[in-house]
Amino acid sequence: MFGWAVTFLIVALVAALLGFTGIAGIATEIAWILFVVGIILFVVFLVLGRRGRPPL
């Protein structure tokens, strides 16, 4: 997921350098959303992993 976020960030930077402001804004928003979702999933799985397995 972070790979996609980095990809969209690079697309946004290239588009911004070339003057395509609409495309740069959209790519930046997609990268930001993917980054936030990745962080949220990381925290959720970190918390769930620390609980351990239930006893049999």
Swiss-Prot record:
- InterPro entries on file: DUF1328
Name the keywords, alphabetized.
Answer: Cell membrane, Membrane, Transmembrane, Transmembrane helix
The family database entries (Pfam families) matched by this protein are listed as:
DUF1328 (PF07043)
GO cellular component term of the entry, any: plasma membrane
Principal cellular location given in the protein's record? membrane
**Any idea where this protein resides?**
Cell membrane
Segments spanning the bilayer are: 6-26, 29-49
Bilayer topology: Multi-pass membrane protein
User: What's this protein's family per the entry?
Assistant: Belongs to the UPF0391 family.
Q: What is this protein called?
A: UPF0391 membrane protein Noc_0484
